[in-house]
């Protein structure tokens, strides 16, 4: 039997742009990732998406128009990837598209990801799978995180418990025991608060190389107040997003006189400390943690993680397991599309709390 090619598209809570990754499968067996393309969000698009995070007028119309705009950008990204790899749409078995999350409310049984999936199928001329979270929510799950099943398929070791940390806008961990099902949950903010602080105080999308945070000092009292949020004491399964940890939440803990560099530095330690606390509680026997996502490019955050974990847990990039840390999430949704095509349940129900494993997503022919 010939192997199959799939493409995954991911745009996360950082809202910086869309990643597309090409993977090769043999039925349900992973063979590797072969290519990547990235399209940054124009500032105007990003602002409109952020505006939709809060309740406002004409939300239905705005969400549908943004779904179409996003799908055109996704199609452009897929086209660039195909050109890079010298492939035609007919070479691709399926396209897995996560969409752009604008609301995540598992307590109400829904999570909203913007994407016009039929339009994306039409524009790319590729069979498209999307709306991955709804099936898990229908089975009583949180709808997030979905990546632990993918991490388990690729990164599990039969000899030891491993942890996989994804640092996007939200940080989440997957715990991969050698002899039990994988599980995971959102640990709390990843880059999201740091990015929001950068945008508010420097008009920059993020802290490149941690350069601004490196000039600040940790504010212990502020850190303690942030760590007291009740989310961190909740048992897993659990998931979160901008609904809980937005800039206006942070500002309720500030008196206005703080040095902006110090607040940014404190937010880095806040992310690292919440990750450490989560891993210490849920994966006390893990000695190796593999890191992916945009946060791995922030040396201040990586130093904070190293300081929190000390010699207890060894920190690595997923590149050491043959998958670029910037490719992991998009590759996961390509893998989920392959699961859909092969009728394989791809949901990490032990992570989300769903009542059973489910085949995730809905498919659209062009």
Curated annotation (Swiss-Prot):
HAMAP family: AnhMurNAc_kinase (MF_01270). It is an enzyme of class 2 (transferase). ATP binds at residues 12-19. Keywords: ATP-binding, Carbohydrate metabolism, Kinase, Nucleotide-binding, Transferase. InterPro entries: Anhydro_N_Ac-Mur_kinase, ATPase_NBD. One of its GO terms (molecular function) is kinase activity. This is Anhydro-N-acetylmuramic acid kinase.
């Amino acid at each position: 039997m010939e192997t199959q090619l799939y493409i995954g598209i991911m745009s996360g809570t950082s809202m910086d742009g869309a990643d597309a990754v090409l993977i090769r499968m043999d039925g349900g067996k992973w063979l590797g990732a072969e290519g990547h393309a990235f399209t940054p969000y124009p500032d105007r698009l990003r602002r409109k998406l952020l505006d939709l995070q809060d309740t406002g007028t004409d939300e239905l119309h705005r969400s549908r128009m943004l779904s179409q705009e996003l799908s055109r950008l996704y199609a452009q990204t897929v086209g660039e990837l195909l050109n890079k790899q010298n492939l035609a749409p007919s070479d691709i078995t399926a396209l897995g598209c996560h969409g752009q999350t604008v609301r995540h409310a598992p307590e109400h049984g829904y999570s909203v990801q913007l994407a016009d999936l039929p339009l994306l199928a039409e524009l790319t001329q590729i069979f498209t799978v999307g709306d991955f979270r709804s099936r898990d929510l229908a089975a009583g799950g949180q709808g997030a995180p979905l990546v632990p099943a993918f991490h388990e398929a690729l990164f599990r070791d039969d000899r030891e418990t491993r942890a996989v940390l994804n640092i996007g806008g939200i940080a989440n961990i997957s715990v991969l025991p050698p002899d039990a099902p994988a599980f995971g949950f959102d640990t709390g903010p990843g880059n999201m608060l740091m990015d929001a602080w950068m945008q508010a105080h420097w008009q920059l999308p993020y802290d490149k190389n941690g350069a601004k945070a490196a000039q600040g000092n940790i504010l212990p009292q502020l850190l303690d107040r942030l760590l007291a949020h009740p989310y961190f004491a909740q048992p897993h399964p659990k998931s979160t997003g901008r609904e809980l940890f937005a800039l206006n939440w942070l500002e309720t803990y500030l008196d206005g006189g703080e040095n902006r560099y110090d607040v940014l530095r404190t937010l880095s330690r806040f992310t690292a400390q919440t990750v450490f606390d989560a891993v210490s509680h849920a994966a006390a026997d893990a000695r190796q943690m593999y890191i992916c996502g945009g946060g791995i490019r922030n040396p201040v955050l990586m130093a904070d993680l190293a300081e929190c974990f000390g010699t207890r847990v060894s920190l690595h990039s997923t590149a050491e397991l043959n998958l670029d840390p910037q490719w992991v999430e998009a590759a996961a949704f390509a893998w989920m599309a392959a699961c859909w095509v092969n009728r394989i349940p791809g949901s990490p129900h032990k992570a989300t709390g769903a009542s059973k494993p489910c085949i995730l997503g809905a498919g659209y022919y062009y």
